[in-house]
């Protein structure tokens, strides 16, 4: 299966976030610690603000793992609503039926 550029980029961002998350949380905790002097707290504040943009959770966008589509994602399956509908009609997704009123 061909890797879509957007999916590759998103995967890289997820990896960067995963690597930086623990250190970033530690710096945030130390930044809020009132037992430390102001200079030390300012240092940790700089560490948090100078981190990479791609290591932020807000840069991560849910995308369809097959098409790279960013809208209409069914998060439980990580595919777009269009692919979900196709697979549902073919019977590839168990336990899901078309709804009728």
Swiss-Prot record:
InterPro entries: Ribosomal_uS14 (IPR001209). Disulfide bonds: none annotated. GO terms for molecular function: structural constituent of ribosome. It comes from the Eukaryota. Keywords: Mitochondrion, Ribonucleoprotein, Ribosomal protein. Pfam families: Ribosomal_S14. GO terms for biological process: translation. It is found in: Mitochondrion. GO terms for cellular component: mitochondrial small ribosomal subunit. Component of the mitochondrial ribosome small subunit (28S) which comprises a 12S rRNA and about 30 distinct proteins. Interacts with LIAT1. Belongs to the universal ribosomal protein uS14 family. This is Small ribosomal subunit protein uS14m. It comes from Dictyostelium citrinum.
């Amino acid at each position: 299966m061909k890797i879509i550029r957007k999916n590759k980029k998103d995967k890289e961002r997820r990896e960067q976030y995963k690597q930086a998350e623990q250190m970033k949380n530690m710096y945030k905790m130390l930044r809020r610690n009132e037992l430390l002097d102001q200079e030390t707290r300012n240092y940790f504040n700089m560490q948090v603000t100078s981190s990479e943009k791609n290591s932020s959770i807000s840069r991560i966008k849910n995308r369809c793992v097959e098409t790279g589509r960013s809208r209409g994602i069914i998060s439980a399956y990580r595919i777009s609503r269009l692919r979900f509908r196709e697979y549902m009609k073919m019977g590839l997704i168990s336990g899901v039926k078309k709804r009728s009123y």
